[in-house]
UniProtKB/Swiss-Prot annotation:
<keyword id="KW-0946">Virion</keyword>
<feature type="short sequence motif" description="Nuclear export signal">
    <location>
        <begin position="122"/>
        <end position="132"/>
    </location>
</feature>
<dbReference type="GO" id="GO:0044423">
    <property type="term" value="C:virion component"/>
</dbReference>
<protein>
    <recommendedName>
        <fullName>Nuclear export protein</fullName>
    </recommendedName>
</protein>
<dbReference type="InterPro" id="IPR005188">
    <property type="entry name" value="Flu_C_NS2"/>
</dbReference>
<dbReference type="GO" id="GO:0039675">
    <property type="term" value="P:exit of virus from host cell nucleus through nuclear pore"/>
</dbReference>
<comment type="similarity">
    <text>Belongs to the influenza viruses NEP family.</text>
</comment>
<dbReference type="InterPro" id="IPR000968">
    <property type="entry name" value="Flu_NS2"/>
</dbReference>
<keyword id="KW-0813">Transport</keyword>
<dbReference type="Pfam" id="PF03555">
    <property type="entry name" value="Flu_C_NS2"/>
</dbReference>
<keyword id="KW-0945">Host-virus interaction</keyword>
<comment type="subunit">
    <text>Interacts with protein M1. May interact with host nucleoporin RAB/HRB and exportin XPO1/CRM1.</text>
</comment>
<comment type="function">
    <text>Mediates the nuclear export of encapsidated genomic RNAs (ribonucleoproteins, RNPs). Acts as an adapter between viral RNPs complexes and the nuclear export machinery of the cell. Possesses no intrinsic RNA-binding activity, but includes a C-terminal M1-binding domain. This domain is believed to allow recognition of RNPs bound to the protein M1.</text>
</comment>
<dbReference type="GO" id="GO:0042025">
    <property type="term" value="C:host cell nucleus"/>
</dbReference>
<keyword id="KW-1048">Host nucleus</keyword>
<feature type="short sequence motif" description="Nuclear export signal">
    <location>
        <begin position="96"/>
        <end position="105"/>
    </location>
</feature>
Length: 182
């Protein structure tokens, strides 16, 4: 069993546990996906156990020790997103990769006020960019709604519904920001 696979399993166990601790931030669909990721990770641990016997708790402890930082908040790990980008191909092939990758949406809530926009950039330029982003997100949401018609399995349907929710929430946030800039 490669070290990279073990680290990926540790990371999956750690993220599933931390996301489930923040259940109030999760919608039902995401919570189901995280539970499924937890089940999948436990299955991977059983597969790995013939090489290095470990429990769910061992995998989480290994990840905490590897990090050697305060584990009280996911907000304190800017390197987590980069780590998720560098995990093994086996993990990227997992259908639960998207909810893990979208974890950054839960950990990077910004309270920055519109009046703290960097000096040198005019509001109309910012508004134009935000409106362009919003229109692209609306197009993505439309394409996702069309994709639902051709879905054969429930896992893909859950992922599409989850990503549509993210699109809609982001669109609303951008429109709210645009209104506050006007």
């Amino acid at each position: 069993m490669s070290d990279k696979t073990v680290k990926s399993t540790n990371l999956m166990a750690f993220i599933a546990t931390k996301m489930l601790e923040r259940q109030e931030d999760l919608d039902t669909c995401t919570e189901m996906q995280v539970e499924k990721m937890k089940t999948s990770t436990k299955a991977r641990l059983r597969t790995e156990s013939s090489f290095a016997p470990r429990t769910w708790e061992d995998a989480i402890k290994d990840e905490i020790l590897r990090r050697s930082v305060d584990t009280s908040s996911l907000d304190k790990w800017p390197e987590l997103k980069q780590e998720l980008e560098n995990v093994s191909d086996a993990l990227k092939a997992d259908s639960l990769w998207l909810p893990m990758k979208s974890l950054s949406l839960y950990s990077k809530v910004s309270n920055q006020e519109p009046n703290s926009i960097p000096i040198g950039e005019m509001k109309h330029q910012i508004l134009t960019r935000l409106k362009l982003i919003c229109s692209r997100l609306e197009k993505l949401d439309l394409n996702l709604s069309k994709a639902v018609l051709g879905i054969q399995n429930s896992e893909d349907l859950i992922l599409i519904i989850y990503n549509r929710d993210i699109c809609k929430t982001t669109i609303l946030m951008i429109k709210s920001l645009c209104n506050s800039l006007i």
